[in-house]
Amino acid sequence: IKDLSEIQYPVNKIQTIEDEEVTTQLALDIQNEFKDQYEVFRTCPRELEVLPKGYSKGATLVRMMDMFGWDKDKVFTFGDGENDVSMFGVVTHSFAMGQAMDYVKEKAAHVTKSNVEQGIVAALKDFNIL
């Protein structure tokens, strides 16, 4: 796709993979131009997600918790990218993975080991769930 006008159907998500500098500039450009229409998340230094305003993992988690009656103290969230941070404020037990960007680690209640070090398993063992 060379121009967004070529798309003739609703767009639920746009994801880009590009050099870190290009991704940084693209995120700023989209936020400046379309901040009232879209959510922009860095999933890692080279990847960007663009979603309709109000769409996020956190918003979806809130809907699921309401629907199923889940208690925020009994739900655990894990993430390593900006797109995961919205979940962290929804629950008591939020974990940034060891490989997460510093910004993500700052927002989580806990930091666990990386994916390759079985970070989710380690965190669940720390809480005597496994």
What are these regions (language model features)?
Residues 76-78, 95, 110-112:
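Hydrophobic/aromatic beta-strand patches that form the interior of the parallel beta-sheet core
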Residues 1-78, 82, 87:
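Conserved acidic, metal-coordinating active-site core of Asp-based
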Residues 90, 98-130:
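Asp-based, Mg2+/Mn2+-dependent phosphohydrolase catalytic module
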Residues 36-40, 94, 130:
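A general structural signal for well-ordered secondary-structure junctions
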Residues 1, 59-63, 95-97, 117-121:
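Short, structured secondary-structure boundary patches
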